[in-house]
Amino acid sequence: MDPILALKAIIMGIVEGFTEFLPISSTGHLILAGSLLDFTGPKVKVFEIAIQTGAMLAVVWEYRAKIAAVLGGLLTERKAQKFALNIIIAFLPAALLGLVFASKIKEKLFAPVPVAIAFIVGGFIILWIEKRNRNTDFVARVETVDDMTMLDALKVGCAQAFALIPGTSRSGASIIGGMFFGLSRKAATEFSFFLAIPTLMGATVYSVYKDRALLSMADIPLFGLGGFAAFVSAFLCVRWLLRYISTHDFTFFAYYRIVFGLFVLLSAYYGWVVWAD
């Protein structure tokens, strides 16, 4: 394996892991990082989706006890059945819309400038939701993921579907969408983690199968390296985020999105950075 190519795969994996579960858009950061590293092309787009499996496995490991309890109780326990059904319901909107529009979105919007615009718009939406929650008599209607109804799950799933637009953020859309519809910050964040499991796995399987002609057995080490880097960084990020939200809101991430998005737009306009499409 080419050492430079391996280093690029590791960097991309780290970027994926650290950004997948923060409301700042992993896809957007991967597009920008790939542009800077000159790591682009049709096969790289498959790589970017495939290494999400590493981030997904980090959630599986962190919540292995909860997941085992749900799987073990699927046939007998109402609580486990309800939780699993909520995940399926929330997964469907993005999955169905993705099947219809994913190719067009990749063709038109997987570029630095559209990503930067989505960063900025998403940042202002986060600020609006956080301000609403601070400045009103807002009280979370749903305190834990086990309190969610099927309608709550559907609403979060519809919010997550907006993340098909690169730069929006899957976790940001599902977390902020959940908070908008009455979930507590902790419930929205944890449900977003669980929702990532079928969402990321489904995206990986679909992308690898659809673009299988681009791939070969020789790609496995590179994909594995990126996936492992994503697993380690995502595991650290999930643990940190759970501590962070116990005492903080998401305002910092909103400002980060706005500032970083403006930087990308200005750097593209003035030629400070050469962003490859």
Curated annotation (Swiss-Prot):
Misc note: Bacitracin is thought to be involved in the inhibition of peptidoglycan synthesis by sequestering undecaprenyl diphosphate, thereby reducing the pool of lipid carrier available.
Species lineage: Bacteria, Pseudomonadati, Pseudomonadota, Betaproteobacteria, Burkholderiales
Keyword list, A-Z: Antibiotic resistance, Cell inner membrane, Cell membrane, Cell shape, Cell wall biogenesis/degradation, Hydrolase, Membrane, Peptidoglycan synthesis, Transmembrane, Transmembrane helix
Keyword Cell inner membrane: yes
Entry's Gene Ontology cellular component terms: plasma membrane
Name used for this protein in its record: Undecaprenyl-diphosphatase
Methyltransferase keyword on record: no
UniProt-annotated location(s): Cell inner membrane
GO biological process: cell wall organization; peptidoglycan biosynthetic process; regulation of cell shape; response to antibiotic
Transmembrane segments: 83-103, 109-129, 188-208, 218-238, 256-276
Gene assigned in the entry: uppP
UniProt xrefs under InterPro entries: UppP
Function as written in the Swiss-Prot or TrEMBL entry: Catalyzes the dephosphorylation of undecaprenyl diphosphate (UPP). Confers resistance to bacitracin.
Cited Pfam families: BacA
Similarity section: Belongs to the UppP family.
EC number assigned by the record: 3.6.1.27
Main location as per UniProt: membrane
Membrane topology: Multi-pass membrane protein
Swiss-Prot/TrEMBL catalytic activity: di-trans,octa-cis-undecaprenyl diphosphate + H2O = di-trans,octa-cis-undecaprenyl phosphate + phosphate + H(+)
One MF term in the entry's GO annotations: undecaprenyl-diphosphatase activity
Organism for this UniProt entry: Janthinobacterium sp. (strain Marseille) (Minibacterium massiliensis)
Top-rank EC class of the record's enzyme: hydrolase
